[in-house]
Amino acid sequence: MGQKSNPIGLRLKIINTWDSLWYANKDYTTKLHEDFLLRKFIKKAFYHASISKVVIARKVDVIMVNVYSAKPGVIIGKKGADIDKVKQQIVKMINNNIELNIIEVKKPELKAVLIAENIAQQLEKRISFRRAMKRSVQSCLKIGAKGIKVSCAGRLGGAEIARTEWYKEGSVPLHTFRANIDYGFSEAKTIYGIIGVKVWVYLGDTKSSNE
């Protein structure tokens, strides 16, 4: 039986690169756990800022954190008050100097993580899963995606038995390595239980970094 691998991990060093840009020897596990903590903290602190990814690069005396957000104003706050507050909390948490950069995501409708989070938020507001999926798919294709596939799994519509529903438009070639496919996952916490939302977005073919 075929298994679905993560399209981003499958294409690392072909068309994608890592979100953690550093090398470590003895204290690798410590730094890895720090990265997990940083991402979890930033995502939680700015839940409504539509964060697509957090890239962490480590230098000798400073950690550079690039936050890609569709709503940078939510993170920065009035006169940068919110971002300074978060910086202080992170420094206290990991005991290291930090440089926090906010990068705006120009087309959030094409980011799989943001699409998944948007669908999850709609499901939490009791909007029909079919309507939420269809709306997100149409807006994604309108912006310029070549194809999109969405799955919702769980007690959909409050059903007794959990099931998985799919919605697909266009082509999503998961087995083509040069295909630029973005993948995102989110969870909707409803009164019936958790519903998992997965999104694959095909943005067209890309030349590999080795060519």
From Swiss-Prot:
InterPro entries xref list: KH_dom (IPR004087), KH_dom-like_a/b (IPR015946), KH_dom_type_2 (IPR004044), KH_sf_prok-type (IPR009019), Ribosomal_S3_C_sf (IPR036419), Ribosomal_uS3_bac-typ (IPR005704), Ribosomal_uS3_C (IPR001351), Ribosomal_uS3_CS (IPR018280)
Cellular compartments per GO CC: cytosolic small ribosomal subunit
Biological process annotations from GO: translation
The UniProt record lists the keyword rRNA-binding: yes
KH type-2 domain span: 38-106
Keywords attached to this entry: Ribonucleoprotein, Ribosomal protein, RNA-binding, rRNA-binding
Highest taxon of the lineage: Bacteria
GO molecular function term, any single one: mRNA binding
Role, per record: Binds the lower part of the 30S subunit head. Binds mRNA in the 70S ribosome, positioning it for translation.
Family assignment from sequence similarity: Belongs to the universal ribosomal protein uS3 family.
Subunit structure: Part of the 30S ribosomal subunit. Forms a tight complex with proteins S10 and S14.
Protein name per Swiss-Prot or TrEMBL: Small ribosomal subunit protein uS3
